Amino acid sequence: MALGVWTERRPGQGEDADPLLLHHRPTRCGVLGVFDGLGGAGSSIAWHDADGNARTDAWVASRMARLATESWFAGEIDDRRAWDSETQAPDIYTDLGAHLRQLFAGVRPTGRRSKVVGTMRRRLPTTVAALRYTARDSDVVCEALWAGDSRAYVLTPDAGLQALTRDHADDPDVLSQLVQDPQMTNMVSADREFFVQRQPYGRIPLPCVLLCATDGFFGYVQTPGDFEHVLLNTLCRSTDLDDWAARLTSTVASYTGDDASLALVALGFRTFDELRAGCAERFAWLDRDASAMPDPRGAEAMRHWRARAWERYRPGYEARLPPPLASDARSQGRTRDEGGTA
């Protein structure tokens, strides 16, 4: 079972690309991903389409990154690389970053950048968050691949939502990010160095849900746990997969201040009813916590409630979180998992 959600804040101007969901049945390999074109850094007009609509650098960048990720995965399948983190050679892991760098380098400006635009401006800036996986009879092996502050997660009936990526940002703490907007320290672009971080995950028991989301979903809620509450609240009220997608779409549109996209695949559940029933107890626990939220107009009470809610939620949420990047790795534009620069 799989679904994608895509909404745009301004009709016709959405800078998130469509979510990516691909599964190759013969090898049981798949990839899902989201791509958030960064409208602030990439607000310059890149081109006009056949209807005369202006498209920004951010709009073009997210679509390019999606295309690059799709073609990278298709190339892996065409080469019959049945991927498994326990057996595959480490150099395979560099392919997505190299693929993105090759594509974006093809549109890198050749002239000197004007001093007027400032250091914040980027040519074709976008985030990438993807999960590459191989499903097996009783577990799934996956790796997270990302640049920027879009996120990848795993959701299980027992442990709930757990982050598989750590934002490339000045302040990676997910609670503080809800009240401030830290600067990103890494993003895909055509005119600056970037890296795609890789984090392999061994056997994750089935059943589970793998998902990727842009910050339009998780960046406009009261606490980090509210995103999981949105996921499970809509799930438990849905009759089937299409209904769940529709409820997610309408719910995120009601609270977000940004474009929002999500890609999700449920593995090991025989039916939608089994998925919904499996998450019912977890949702009941989350709902009890959410129902205790004070009036948001009471700033002090709200601050204390948020801190307490995060204290309860944090251990499970961060149980699989990768360690922070070393400062020298960040400054050099590479990690121990994926080397190279643009």
Where are these regions (language model features)?
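N-terminal entry segment of metal-dependent catalytic domains or homologous docking segments
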Residues: 1-71, 150
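Catalytic core of PPM/PP2C metal-dependent serine/threonine phosphatase domains
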Residues: 80-157, 184-206
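Short glycine- and acidic-rich boundary segments immediately preceding or forming the N-terminal edge
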Residues: 1-26, 98-119, 137-138, 165-181, ...
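Short hydrophobic beta-strand that contains or immediately precedes a catalytic carboxylate
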Residues: 32-36, 145-147, 211-213
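Short beta-strand-to-coil "C-cap" segments at the C-terminal boundary of structured domains/repeats
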Residues: 22, 133-134, 155-157, 264-271
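Glycine- and acidic-residue-rich phosphate-binding/metal-coordinating active-site segment common to enzymes
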Residues: 156-194
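Helix-loop-helix
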Residues: 50-95, 230-250
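C-terminal catalytic subdomain
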Residues: 190-342
